[in-house]
Curated annotation (Swiss-Prot):
UniProt cross-references to Pfam families, sorted A to Z: DAHP_synth_1
Highest taxon of source: Bacteria
Keywords: Cytoplasm, Lipopolysaccharide biosynthesis, Transferase
Source species of the chain: Vibrio cholerae serotype O1 (strain ATCC 39541 / Classical Ogawa 395 / O395)
Subcellular location: Cytoplasm
Range of residues in the leader sequence: none
Major subcellular site: cytoplasm
Gene Ontology MF terms: 3-deoxy-8-phosphooctulonate synthase activity
Pathway: Carbohydrate biosynthesis; 3-deoxy-D-manno-octulosonate biosynthesis; 3-deoxy-D-manno-octulosonate from D-ribulose 5-phosphate: step 2/3; Bacterial outer membrane biogenesis; lipopolysaccharide biosynthesis
Catalytic activity: D-arabinose 5-phosphate + phosphoenolpyruvate + H2O = 3-deoxy-alpha-D-manno-2-octulosonate-8-phosphate + phosphate
Record protein name field: 2-dehydro-3-deoxyphosphooctonate aldolase
Family: Belongs to the KdsA family.
Amino acid sequence: MEHKIVHVGDIPVANDKPFTLFAGMNVLESRDLAMQICEHYVKVTDKLGIPYVFKASFDKANRSSVHSYRGPGLEEGMKIFQELKETFGVKIITDVHTEAQAQPVADVVDVIQLPAFLARQTDLVEAMAKTGAVINVKKPQFMSPGQVGNIVEKFAECGNDKVILCERGSCHGYDNLVVDMLGFGVMKQASNGSPIIFDVTHSLQMRDPSGAASGGRREQTVELAKAGLATGIAGLFIEAHPNPDKARCDGPSALPLDKLEPFLAQMKALDDLIKSFAHIDIR
């Protein structure tokens, strides 16, 4: 199978290339915190030689509770992203939730993300495709790996073949997610070799049935990330925070920021090893 390359600026993202890190914070909590977190990521990834794209949301439109923090909104969010790009020279990925957001966001960031809950919404797909931006599709928790080909085809029919696919776990009963490691290979086949990245952070979510926000299992970040990279994929998607217990969204799944460098050092070593192996074709 041929591995498709999607370029994020000068970064080639593909399943047979060194892994790209799509990472940052869950939601923009403040300009200063975004600057702090982005600076740390840039410092660590530069040191380790890992291609990097900063991630944050400007509007968490899918929060469980109407009382939960959503973010600074479109206008302020784009100002923060622009400052991050100018200050650190970093690429940026963020999610959009409506057709009207697609072009204004694509005018600022490098990758626009289709949220898992909205992955079948054709009008949103069309609006995102028309921007010409690189697209990151979060595979829905309710969708089998083989069905992602339909989403890739939908974008292609709308004129955009610059699609990255993101695994983020599948529903396993109520309030739990599991990751099927066989699914990475199925997604590659179903999408004709599209780049696959692995959202480790959100795959670690575990909801409290009586709560208004997701719980998580961040203590298992390392083992899950290692398992995903061992399948030979294009990248990892993670979120970190200086104080995860105080994060305004998904703190229980977030990596403590001071663990970022040792975590990424191990991930790079594993990825380099896996991609040094010759492919064994078994039919």
